[in-house]
Amino acid sequence: MSIVIPRRNWTTGTVYDYYRHDYGHYVTGSTSSVVTADSGATALYDATFYVLTDDNNVYKCLDNNGGVASTVKPTGTSNSILTTSPDGYKWKYMYSLSAAQQTNFLSTDFMAVATNSTVAAANTDGAIDIVKIKTAGSGGTDGTHTGISIKGDGSGELFP
């Protein structure tokens, strides 16, 4: 027995949704507009934020570079965020399907969910890997920045 999710094969030229826990929730300050994925999904279950490659590796999309088409297949099993170039997607390796999982739980419509102990051990509870800037302002420096302090009082979270 295995938990399964809809199968989503990586295909070049597809715009993938990036992972966001609040698809379908009201946009801040609105009572009529909801957070919608690039695919039009209004629920995380329907969003195309993960892919299965022909290497039988599963990746989660952390950033789709502003909604451009994915043209480079994510590869590798590193615990670091994988950036594909030139499309600019950022992916997180999640797990690989074993031969037994492929035989028993991989169909044209569904695929097994598995836990990779190496990935799980390398994760940090509460880590923030990607930050989306809503309004950038001016005077900043473009690029990747590390060691940014996150300050907040815990209010406004959707899932305490």
Feature-to-residue mapping (PLM):
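Extended assembly-interface regions of large multimeric machines
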Residues: 1-69, 74-112
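Conserved, function-critical positions that sit in or immediately flank catalytic
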Residues: 85-160
